[in-house]
Amino acid sequence: MSKDKALDIVLSEFLELAKVPRPSHHEERVSEYLFQWAKRHGLAVEKDNMNEIIIDKPATPGCENVPRVIFQAHMDMVCVCEEGVTYDPMNDPIKVINDDVTLTADGTSLGADDGIGVAMCLYLLQDDTLRHGPIRAIFTTNEEDGMDSVSYKHLTLP
């Protein structure tokens, strides 16, 4: 896949993610978004009681014995807005401004930390041009305010 095509996919995934409200401690909608994304792409997916998501992509033929690679990104974002801006982080999407050089948000935080990490993981999970061993993507919750959902169970490889 060309670099431009890969960047287009990452940007597209990020812009879709920006439509889903995802403040810390309220990641239910973004968790469900990622769960359904995995189902649409035919990937194995699990959701735990903290709304964390684990998506597994099998190895490409001939790479089954290559060690698993794990990618991790957090779903939540810091939700702030400029004075005078009406913004409800529980319900409002991020209004992204794309000037073809940079991405910014219209009066609110952008959510690039770690939305771009989530988008990059989604790109890697859908790219069928690369040969790879098993891939696991872990999407955690509440990183911005305590990291109390993160558990080390994800680090245990089967």
What are these regions (language model features)?
Residues P21, K153-P158:
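Conserved small/polar residues in nucleotide/adenosyl-binding loops
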Residues C63-P134, F139, E144, S151:
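Active-site metal-coordination/substrate-binding segment of hydrolases
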Residues S2-V101:
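Acidic/His- and Gly-rich active-site-bordering loop/insert found
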